[in-house]
Amino acid sequence: NPDANGWHFTWSSCCRNSNITNGLADAGFTLRAVMYSYTDSLGQVLPSNDQCHDSSPKFYEIPRTILEVGNGNDPSAPAFSNGFTYSHNAFDEEKDSISYTWGIPLSNVGYDYLTPNSTALPFSAPYSYTNPINNIFLNSTTGRTWYPANQQGNFVTCTKVSAFKCGQLVSEIYREIQVVIIPPTCNIGLNANECNV
């Protein structure tokens, strides 16, 4: 059985984009998931015999990574809804409850499951792992993110999805997406034949 620290599944590689705006460019990265044991209603601790009895949440939305400045801009919309909205659409097959928080992106150097954040990607001010894009918002229940998409750049984001079975944490999966916001290539309101793409 995994101990209180869980089983950590990682994959690391080099390198991140050279043009990252909010953190260390060219650093490596580590993708990860953590599985924890839980006690069922009969008092049995699972997983047993080194076999997993649970799966982590899966993402049913492909990453939207390249956007134009002003994407989703609607001057008549309420201020909070005026921007780009994205949902990870995480789903847990066992119907475990899930919640979303910002995760800490990691480099590819020396992952330590006891202190995984020791290899955290350093962010450049004013950015942080909880504010990887200016004015970004994450709904912890739905996983929807919203941001104004009003600044060009390459932004590393990391979302942690935690799954709970009967109130017990059973898994965490971290999803990194690099969002690239480029200059406008198509004027809003033009049809597809008039766009410069």
Give names to the regions the model predicted.
Residues N1-C195:
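Long, compositionally biased, intrinsically disordered segments
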